[in-house]
Amino acid sequence: MSDETVASVAQLYLGNILYALERAALSLEEDNRRDDAAFYRGIARKLAEARGRERGAQAEAR
C-alpha cells in the first residue's frame, strides 16, 4: 500500500494542475462561457495562493 495522499500528489503535480485549469478556462472562454472560465481560474488561484502561504511558512521555519 502506498503512503501517497491527495495533498502529496497534488503538491507534486501542482504546476501541471494549474496549467490544465488555465487551458480549461481558455477553452471555456472560446465557447463564450466566461462564468465557467472564471470558476476554474478561481480554483487555480486558491491552489496557487495556498502553495504560496505554505512556502512562506516553510521559509519562516528555517
Regions from the language model: what does each represent?
Residues 45-61:
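Short, charge-rich amphipathic alpha-helical segments embedded
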Residues 18, 44-45:
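Short linear sequence elements within intrinsically disordered, low-complexity coil regions
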Residues 1-24, 55:
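N-terminal acidic leader/helix
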